[in-house]
């Protein structure tokens, strides 16, 4: 970590003196100081140079190599994961970069469909994990992609009538409209299966996420594996699985040790491997995509600053906080509802005694989730 910190700080120091062409980790721009401007290509910088005959006035990171600028500005390669504390400190200043240059939850369906169109797998699995951060799985597989939750980092929200699912918040924003299944169905994936652990009182959201998919509520993951073993897939098939992640643990126990959290993360990985092992016996080309709705900030692992906003949840509010607290939020408007998500490490209200973790705000842990891909060829 010392080397990473040094490389990050050296880049910050260099940016204070000159624009830099950066071949960097995709999350590094989120860690840079608020004064740093991030541009995709050198065209804007060139136009400034033409106008001013001098270097740009603000620190500038140029993301794409540019032969026109290479002789004038240094190129820095920094592929290591940036310091998490720097991301949490600065990411609210670089939301434009996150929305335009990172995969977002709104882009998952298109990215998945595009990949399937190119690869033409026989069996496609989408595992939706309720509560898992990019940082939790970073060492699982080299191809895991950081995905930005562009909105309140929650599982779903209902309209005031408590019957209508808001389509641009949480899992609904990931499944998309048209849904993953609707898009794959048009590509020939006529056979579909769905599995969820959610209880019947979650039927509204389950019906939304599993629309037109024959879906089974299961008590545990073993039931999914047992059913998959019983099938012989002779046609192109789409399988959608809702897997409990860390969300349930965050809201069901007063305290969670790091060992318990790590054990739950390992169990998710093992379930991915078990699904792949079962489906590999089909002797077909299989791909499993994994994505989460949000990550978790654990209660005992952070030095919180409590703002005591009336009517607020710990990490977000649907009512506008007072001016002082509002300065510590990012405002989203999704499906006609306004959300004020707190930046790190602020809480609108204290974490419930029975909760060991929270989500809903803007942070590396909550707002950067994994989009991972596992193949059987």
PLM features: what roles do these ranges have?
Residues 1-377:
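Feature captures the catalytic ectodomains and active-site-proximal regions of enzymes
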């Amino acid at each position: 970590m010392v080397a990473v910190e040094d490389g990050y700080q050296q880049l910050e120091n260099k940016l204070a003196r000159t624009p830099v062409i950066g071949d960097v980790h995709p999350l590094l721009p989120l860690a840079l100081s608020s004064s740093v401007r991030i541009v995709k290509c050198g065209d804007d910088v060139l136009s400034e140079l033409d106008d001013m005959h001098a270097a740009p006035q603000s620190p500038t990171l140029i993301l794409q190599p540019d032969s026109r600028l290479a002789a004038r500005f240094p190129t820095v390669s920094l592929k290591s994961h940036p310091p998490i504390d720097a991301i949490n400190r600065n990411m609210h200043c670089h939301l434009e970069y996150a929305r335009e240059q990172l995969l977002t939850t709104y882009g998952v369906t298109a990215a998945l469909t595009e990949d399937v169109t190119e690869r033409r797998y026989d069996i496609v699995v989408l595992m939706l994990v309720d509560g898992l951060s990019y940082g939790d799985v970073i060492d699982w597989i080299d191809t895991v992609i950081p995905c930005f939750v562009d909105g309140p980092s929650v599982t779903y929200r209902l309209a005031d009538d408590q019957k209508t699912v808001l389509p641009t918040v949480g899992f609904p924003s990931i499944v998309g409209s048209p849904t993953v299944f609707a898009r794959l169905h048009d590509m020939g994936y006529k056979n579909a299966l769905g599995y969820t652990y959610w209880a019947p009182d979650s039927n509204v959201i389950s019906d939304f996420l599993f629309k037109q998919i024959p879906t089974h509520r299961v008590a545990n993951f073993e039931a999914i594996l047992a059913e998959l073993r019983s099938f012989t897939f002779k046609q192109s098939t789409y399988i959608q699985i809702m897997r409990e992640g860390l969300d349930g643990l965050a809201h069901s126990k007063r305290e969670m040790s790091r060992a318990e959290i790590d054990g739950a993360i390992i169990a998710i990985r093992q379930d991915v491997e078990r699904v792949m092992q079962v489906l590999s016996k089909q002797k077909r080309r299989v791909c499993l995509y994994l994505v989460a709705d949000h990550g978790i900030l654990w209660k005992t692992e952070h030095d919180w600053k409590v703002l005591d906003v009336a009517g607020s949840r710990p990490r977000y509010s649907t009512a506008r906080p007072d001016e002082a607290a509002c300065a510590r939020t990012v405002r989203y408007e999704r499906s006609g509802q306004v959300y004020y998500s707190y930046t790190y490490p602020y809480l609108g209200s204290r974490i419930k005694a029975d909760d060991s973790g929270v989500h809903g705000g803007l942070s590396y842990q909550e707002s950067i989730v994994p989009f991972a891909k596992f193949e059987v060829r």
